[in-house]
Amino acid sequence: WGSDLAPGVAVLTAGVDVQGDRIEVQIVGWGRDEEAWVIDYRVLWGDPSGPRLWSDLDGVLNGTWGDLAVRAVAVDTGGHHTKMAYEFCRTRLARRVWAIKGRGGPGLPVWPRRPTRTNKGKIPLFIVGVDAVKDAVYARLKLTEPGPGAIHFPRRLDADYFRQLTAERVVTRFEKGRPLRSWQPKRDGERNEALDTFVYAHAALHGLISMGMRLNEEAEAFGGRGQALRLRSPEVIRSSWMK
């Protein structure tokens, strides 16, 4: 699709991944039966150990797309600059900016029934079952028709985005005769931020659902407005730290 988005999109969530020299953020729109549209993808370059880059991220998350603002955000705290990520989430809990940590393995739900409490920052930490989300995402990527579970991408996304989105595969190994499956990079050193941030945005949606949000009802209510969303072009933002 191009720059207009059908009014079936009712809810926006975001996933945030922190790297050593940048923050990447993906905003996903959700409609009936979890039909999804990638709304925006940003690479914010700078130093995550200081406040300026986080201010850039806050500016993105405070934006609006058409009538919609981001309803929930999942920020990965399991990698770089954990302390800064916790502090960012701690001061924005009222906006549903949640600290998360991905965990692989069978049987883990997409979103936990209750958070744990972090030692750093004393804030709720939500353990996300990333394998369950990746299973769902890769199954949905095979769908070729609009409808429940389908994922739509704007034409402006480049090839690197799709390489990252499809950078992993399921590997099955046997331990004491039992098959154990896990998601692994297809190649060593393969970047996968597009996949991770989509997974986190999906997890944020389930965080909202766990709080009682009814996605299909939201989609019906918003669809009645008969409006399309005019989307902004993707940007690569260079933090003021780099100037």
Task: Indicate where each model-derived feature is located.
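Mg2+-dependent endonuclease catalytic cores in nucleic-acid-processing enzymes, primarily RNase H-like
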Residues: W1-A6, A14, V25, D33-R178, ...
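Extracellular low-complexity, Gly/Ser/Thr-rich intrinsically disordered linkers
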Residues: T166-M213
